[in-house]
C-alpha cells in the first residue's frame, strides 16, 4: 500500500510540473504558398510501402492533399503528352532527377523547454528540414494550452511547423492525486474536453491505468507510455 501511495504521489508531482515555456514560433514571413494547386514535376517517387521507386511522375497537390500521381513518361525519354495541367494560381516545381517520399512522423518529439536552450521556431524548422512533417509531443511539456495553440497555428499555415499532436501527461493539471478509477475517468474526460489528442502514461496502479485507458479509447483518443 505504501509503495502504491508513493508511486501515485510521484506520478502526480511529475505530471503536474512542466518545462518552463519557451517562446512560441513567430508568424511565418518567408517562403511561398499555400497554392491553389502544386504540381511536383518529373520526380522519382518512393511511396513508403516497400515497393521499388517509380518515375518519373507528376504529383498533384490541392488543398493540402495529394489528389493525383500521374506518369510523366519513361526515364531518359521525352516527357509524356498527357500530363496534368496547371490550374490558375498554381505552382510548378521541376524536380527531374530528384526523389520524393512521404513526410516522416516523429512519434516522440518533445518541443522542449528553456533547459533545451532553443525556441520553438528553431525546433520546428529543424524537424521540417529533416523531412518530419508530423510530430507527437508526449507530455505536452510546455502546457496543453500552449501546445494546442501552436497546433492550431501550424494547421492554419501561419507558422513554419509540422503538424502537431498533443499528448497530455496523465494527471497533469489535476487538483489532487488520482487515487481511484473514478478520478482517473473524470480526468480523462476533462482532458478530452480540453482538446488533447491523447495521453502519455508514466505509470499508475493497474486498476487506475486500466480505467483511464478504457475511457480514453471510448472517447476516441490515443495513448502512449514511458516504459523504462
Protein language model regions, located:
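Bacterial N-terminal signal peptides that target proteins for export
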Residues: 1-7
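Bacterial N-terminal signal peptides
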Residues: 7-17
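Histidine-rich, glycine-flanked metal-binding segment
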Residues: 22-33, 45, 51-101
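Divalent-metal coordination cores built from histidine and acidic residues
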Residues: 26, 34, 95-107, 119-228
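Short active-site segment of divalent metal-dependent hydrolases/proteases
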Residues: 111-112
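Catalytic Zn2+-binding segment of zinc metalloproteases
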Residues: 115
Amino acid at each position: 500500500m505504501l509503495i502504491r501511495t508513493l508511486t501515485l504521489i510521484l506520478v502526480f508531482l511529475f505530471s503536474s510540473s512542466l518545462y518552463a515555456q519557451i517562446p512560441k514560433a513567430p508568424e511565418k514571413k518567408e517562403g511561398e504558398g499555400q497554392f491553389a494547386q502544386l504540381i511536383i514535376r518529373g520526380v522519382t517517387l518512393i511511396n513508403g510501402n516497400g515497393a521499388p521507386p517509380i518515375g518519373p511522375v507528376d504529383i498533384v497537390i490541392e488543398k493540402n492533399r495529394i489528389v493525383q500521381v500521374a506518369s510523366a513518361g519513361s526515364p531518359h525519354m521525352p516527357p509524356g503528352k498527357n500530363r496534368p495541367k496547371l490550374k490558375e494560381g498554381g505552382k510548378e516545381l521541376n524536380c527531374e532527377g530528384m526523389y520524393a517520399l512521404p513526410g516522416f512522423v516523429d512519434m516522440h518529439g518533445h518541443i522542449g523547454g528553456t533547459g533545451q536552450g532553443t525556441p520553438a521556431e528553431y525546433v520546428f524548422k529543424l524537424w521540417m528540414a529533416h523531412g518530419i512533417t508530423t510530430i507527437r509531443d508526449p507530455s505536452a511539456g510546455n502546457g496543453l494550452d500552449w501546445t494546442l495553440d501552436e497546433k492550431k497555428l501550424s494547421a492554419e499555415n501561419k507558422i513554419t511547423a509540422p503538424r502537431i499532436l498533443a499528448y497530455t501527461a496523465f494527471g497533469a493539471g489535476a487538483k489532487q492525486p488520482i487515487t481511484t478509477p473514478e478520478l482517473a475517468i473524470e480526468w480523462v474526460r476533462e482532458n478530452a474536453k480540453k482538446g488533447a489528442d491523447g495521453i502519455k502514461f508514466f505509470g499508475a496502479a493497474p486498476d487506475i491505468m486500466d480505467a483511464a485507458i478504457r475511457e480514453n479509447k471510448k472517447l476516441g483518443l490515443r495513448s502512449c507510455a514511458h516504459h523504462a
